[in-house]
């Protein structure tokens, strides 16, 4: 045997040993870990993720894994490897936290609101058994799909636990869905039983005759005597939640525990384009994701969590799996976002998960209050903020006097006890994250994920004070960036490699339900999920999201546009509440539709001496439009937008983009085809104006 074959054999043995080895106790002990300059500089002392050695790579791009588990992707909780399914997870909680508070609500049976009343883990376990037994009693076969069509409340989680313990597949439906979307999902997933509330019952009944798979409708809450009775010829029974519980108690059934690879849920993506897709997630997928997240996200049985983000979304769903594992108490909001602050004051949570939209509102509200207070109060806030910010940057504790004088009043807005804040679903600006850390004093972390990865792909590590990134890979997956030459993103880019984020590991969904074609479009032959997001690696192995591939379009001269990136830049303008950027291959310029902040608009108009007229007239005022566009240009230059990325015309509207007017998904992302249609007249008029001012500006060459 020559030296080259001997060397090759030794390398092969090293690769096999590395791949099959368990979690190493110290990354320094492994000679296989190397700094790789082409993949972003890092060192082992403060590296949050590591690059696999070249010979371990799959394909041409560097593969990153969490430094917490570099050679073995996590698939189970390290402390409880016996937990393999959602049923196992809940059984663990019922056993270990039986008498601990679990589900709390302020809403009474008659609809009034009072103090939080609690159900223990043990009581929830009993209700779960009764509910699952009730479904079996009604002849719903094991493996059937069960729809959940109402907002967050204790019964939502009990239904979900019952599905897990009796091998049903839960199919969450956003309460904001209309009859057409409900009909599509119910028929597509062949839902046999569906849980709803009085508010969603009518929407359901209006299309029940067109949903032949449904055999049982269970109404949560409300009065039993008000339930409609359907003709026996319909083949559908309508019962109340309480009646189903009693039927289950009278006819108890043993558990039918699922296997790890059994389907746990089909989550229908909200869909910014076209028809919703059913994301199929197994018990193993969900347990792996949450187990990986538990390496850096630590809850305690003394924690209190408020649930108000939609449980139909994977972000809140994963949070609930994690709260069960740690035995956390979960209090629910009343169901009205306008009353959320009242619920926070009553519950006083220690853990708060939200989305940038709410954090931005908190930030803007406090900053505006500080500026309008003026004088001594404003100077005191600025002194306190700068002192505490500097202390945090230096890794030190700030003087408690600043909390007593300034920040405790701000903390009280969220109940006064929040120690841990998480943000997801869309990017949180570095300024807002810094603000939350300083003002609330606890840990603030941002994550990145998607339904197709069972939630978290990456998250910020504890002790990492750098903002503007989404942290290191979840220990349950590996990440690589793939070149996107048409957008000029490559792994050879300096100073940081850039490309489309691709993910692989036990967190990856099994596919889109009944849609093999679209499944193959996003998962390649090597098992890599192509996310459509563009990222780069920062020093330390931190991932930063910089662009979006899926929503890109071309302008007339061939420039590629990523509208979400531009919209996020313009969101920093003082006038802008929301922004929709539009362009196409027939025009050489971008145009913008801006939902204005009415308070800022009124204040600015008064300061500029623009008198008379209502807000709608202000939106149509050429002077106002010019001021807004000028402010957008200023922010765009600060963000170093390229020339063709600037909006050349703007339409101002008072109406916000909402779920109700069909312009937003339930996760507050713009539905682009719908927005294009909704603002079609405004878009046409803007291009006419641009064409009149410069006939060559909006025609292809």
From Swiss-Prot:
Catalyzed reactions per annotation: a long-chain fatty acid + ATP + CoA = a long-chain fatty acyl-CoA + AMP + diphosphate; tetradecanoate + ATP + CoA = tetradecanoyl-CoA + AMP + diphosphate; hexadecanoate + ATP + CoA = hexadecanoyl-CoA + AMP + diphosphate; (9Z)-octadecenoate + ATP + CoA = (9Z)-octadecenoyl-CoA + AMP + diphosphate
Null allele phenotype: Seedlings of the lacs6 and lacs7 double mutant were arrested in postgerminative growth due to inability to mobilize fatty acids for beta-oxidation, a necessary process to pursue the development.
Induction, as annotated: Up-regulated by ozone.
Location(s) in or outside the cell: Peroxisome; Glyoxysome membrane
Chief location category: other
Motif placement: Microbody targeting signal: 15-23
Gene Ontology annotations for the cellular component aspect, listed alphabetically: cytosol; glyoxysomal membrane; peroxisome
Membrane topology of this protein: Peripheral membrane protein
Coiled-coil region list: none
CDD domains, per database record: LC-FACS_euk
Listed pathway(s): Lipid metabolism; fatty acid metabolism
Keywords linked to the UniProt accession: ATP-binding, Developmental protein, Fatty acid metabolism, Glyoxysome, Ligase, Lipid metabolism, Magnesium, Membrane, Nucleotide-binding, Peroxisome
GO biological process, one term: response to ozone
Pfam families: AMP-binding
Cofactor dependence: Mg(2+)
GO molecular function list: ATP binding; long-chain fatty acid-CoA ligase activity
Tissue-specificity statement: Expressed in roots, stems, leaves flowers and germinating seedling. Preferentially expressed in seeds and senescent leaves.
Binding of ATP, residues: 266-277
PANTHER family on file: AMP-BINDING DOMAIN-CONTAINING PROTEIN-RELATED, LONG-CHAIN-FATTY-ACID--COA LIGASE
Membership in a protein family: Belongs to the ATP-dependent AMP-binding enzyme family.
Protein name: Long chain acyl-CoA synthetase 6, peroxisomal
Organism: Arabidopsis thaliana (Mouse-ear cress)
Upper classification of the organism: Eukaryota, Viridiplantae, Streptophyta, Embryophyta, Tracheophyta
């Amino acid at each position: 045997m020559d030296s080259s074959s001997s060397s090759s054999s030794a390398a092969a043995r090293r690769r096999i040993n590395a791949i099959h080895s368990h979690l190493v106790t110290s990354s320094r002990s492994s000679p296989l870990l190397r700094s790789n300059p082409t993949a972003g500089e890092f060192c082992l002392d403060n590296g949050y993720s590591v690059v696999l050695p070249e010979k371990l790579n799959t394909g041409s791009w560097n593969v990153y894994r969490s430094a917490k588990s570099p050679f073995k992707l996590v698939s189970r909780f390290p402390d409880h490897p016996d937990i393999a399914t959602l049923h196992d997870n809940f059984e663990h909680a019922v056993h270990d936290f039986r008498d601990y508070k679990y589900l709390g609500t302020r809403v009474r049976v008659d609809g009034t609101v009072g103090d939080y009343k609690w159900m223990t883990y043990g009581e929830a376990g009993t209700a779960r058994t009764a509910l699952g037994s009730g479904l079996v009693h009604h002849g719903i076969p094991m493996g059937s799909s069960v729809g959940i069509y109402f907002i967050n409340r204790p019964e939502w989680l009990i239904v979900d636990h019952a599905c897990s313990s009796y091998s049903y597949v839960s199919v969450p439906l956003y309460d904001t869905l209309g009859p057409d979307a409900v009909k599509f999902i119910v028929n597509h997933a062949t839902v046999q039983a569906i849980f709803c509330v009085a508010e969603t019952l009518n929407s359901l009944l209006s299309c029940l005759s067109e949903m032949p798979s449904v055999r049982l409708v269970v109404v949560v809450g409300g009065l039993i005597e008000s339930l409609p009775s359907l003709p026996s010829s319909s083949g559908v029974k309508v019962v109340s939640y309480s009646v189903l519980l009693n039927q289950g108690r009278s006819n108890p059934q043993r558990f039918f525990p699922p296997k790890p690879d059994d389907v746990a849920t089909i989550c229908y993506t909200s869909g910014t384009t076209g028809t919703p897709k059913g994301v199929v997630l197994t018990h193993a997928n969900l347990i792996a994701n949450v187990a990986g997240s538990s390496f850096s996200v630590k809850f305690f049985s003394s924690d209190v969590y408020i649930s108000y983000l939609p449980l139909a979304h994977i972000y809140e769903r994963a949070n609930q799996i994690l709260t069960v594992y740690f035995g956390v108490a979960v209090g629910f909001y009343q169901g009205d976002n306008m009353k959320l602050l009242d619920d926070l004051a009553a519950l006083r949570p220690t853990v708060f998960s939200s989305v940038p939209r709410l954090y931005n509102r908190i930030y803007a509200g406090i900053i505006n209050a500080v500026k309008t207070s003026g004088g001594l109060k404003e100077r005191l806030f600025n002194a306190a903020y700068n002192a505490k910010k500097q202390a945090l940057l230096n890794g030190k504790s700030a003087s408690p006097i600043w909390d007593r004088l300034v920040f405790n009043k701000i903390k009280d807005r969220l109940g006064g006890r929040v120690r841990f804040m998480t943000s997801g679903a869309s990017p949180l600006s570095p300024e807002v994250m810094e603000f939350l850390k300083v003002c609330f004093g606890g840990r603030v972390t941002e994550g990145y994920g998607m339904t197709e990865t069972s939630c978290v792909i990456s998250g910020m590590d504890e002790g990492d004070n750098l903002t503007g990134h989404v942290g290191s890979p979840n220990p349950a997956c590996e990440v690589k960036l793939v070149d996107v030459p048409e957008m000029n993103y490559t792994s050879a880019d300096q100073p940081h490699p850039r490309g489309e984020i691709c993910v692989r590991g036990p967190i990856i969904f099994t596919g889109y339900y009944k849609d093999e074609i679209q499944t193959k479009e996003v998962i390649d032959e090597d098992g890599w999920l192509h996310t459509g997001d563009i990222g780069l690696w920062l020093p330390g192995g931190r991932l930063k999201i910089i662009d979006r591939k899926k929503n890109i379009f071309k302008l007339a001269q061939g420039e590629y546009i990523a509208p979400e990136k531009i919209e996020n830049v313009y969101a920093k303008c003082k006038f802008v509440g929301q922004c929709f950027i539009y362009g196409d291959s027939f025009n050489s310029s971008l145009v913008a539709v801006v939902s204005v902040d009415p308070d800022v608009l009124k204040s600015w108009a008064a300061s500029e001496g623009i008198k008379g007229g209502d807000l709608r007239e202000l939106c149509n005022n050429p002077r106002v439009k010019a001021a807004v566009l000028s402010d957008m240009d200023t922010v765009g230059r600060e963000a170093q937008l390229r020339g063709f990325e600037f909006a050349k015309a703007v339409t101002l509207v008072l109406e916000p983009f909402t779920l109700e007017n069909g312009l937003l998904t339930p996760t507050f992302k713009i539905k682009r085809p719908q927005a294009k249609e909704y603002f079609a007249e405004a878009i046409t008029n803007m291009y006419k104006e641009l064409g009149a001012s410069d006939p060559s500006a909006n025609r292809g060459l």
